[in-house]
Amino acid sequence: DAVEAAKLLDITLTTRGQMDGVPIKMAGVPFHAAEQYLARLVKMGKSVAVCEQVGEVGAGKGPVERKVVRIVTPGTLTDAAFLEDKETNRIAAVNADKKHIAIAWASLQSGEFKTKLTTADKLADELARLQAAEILLPEGKSLPDGFHATSANITRLNSWQFAADAGAKLLTEYFGCQDLHGFGLDGKEHEAAVGAAGALLNYIRL
């Protein structure tokens, strides 16, 4: 909100109008510098929703209608101007069932989109190798003790988003195929990987 943005970006907090007798707090930046401020917020681990005006000024009483047209998160930042030289900005998802642990990861810069099965004792090393800027986890789940996510932002999603059947539907629709046999993900042992990939795909398509 405006209070948090003003504090994080060191910009002026103002008020304009009232709602239920309480002043409405606002904070703004110059339009030409908006992308730079957006990148700063994302680098701090914040997710930013970009809205555009879609209603006509004076068309009715109350605020002009606006619509969310873009959501930027730590793992979906792609503008090379705001990334370190040669830095690949990855986002990953971790999922597990009773027998298997899986990681799916993607880079919106390069189009990379992969998934693999791993084990509990190797998960920390796999995540460290990927150096993902953002890691998606089901609610109630945590990363292994051996992994210290000093540079990764953890985003928790509803557990149903990691379901294998939902993931398979999303993946086959997106890639235009009847099943996941061609990707080597059609076995029971790959359900955790399909769930991770589906949750990741759904998130980055927002």
Question: Which residues fall in each region the model found?
Answer:
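Charged catalytic and DNA/RNA-contacting regions of genome-maintenance
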Residues: 1-206
